């Protein structure tokens, strides 16, 4: 997965916007104004932070060396994913989708796309 594939996948979800609130080197994806993914544009290989269920976050970190506690984030709820070829592509997409769903579910009903 490269940054363009990541970007297109994130933008395929309902009510997603992309922004650069932390400078031009950090691409942020939000659902209804809440962050679900942050990607460092200067990182090689690609890496990004995603929200994760706390138990699942630990399980993923134990299974993959390239999944770490979220850099500059709440380590209980966020993981940093380093895309270096050791994580199956379907799992990367699953983690992104799960992050989107977690953040969407935390929104007040009035801000959810599908009420």
Give, region by region, the residue ranges found by the protein language model.
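Charge-dense, helix-prone N-terminal extensions
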Residues: 1-115
């Amino acid at each position: 997965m490269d940054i363009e594939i990541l970007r297109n996948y994130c933008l395929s979800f309902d009510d997603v916007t992309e922004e650069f609130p932390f400078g031009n080197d950090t691409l942020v994806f939000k659902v209804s104004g809440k962050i679900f993914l942050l990607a460092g544009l200067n990182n090689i290989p690609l890496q990004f932070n995603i929200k994760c269920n706390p138990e699942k976050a630990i399980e993923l970190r134990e299974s993959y060396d390239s999944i770490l506690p979220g850099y500059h984030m709440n380590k209980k709820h966020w993981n940093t994913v380093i895309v270096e070829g050791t994580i199956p592509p379907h799992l990367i997409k699953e983690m992104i989708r799960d992050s989107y769903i977690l953040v969407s579910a935390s929104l007040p009903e009035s801000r959810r796309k599908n009420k």
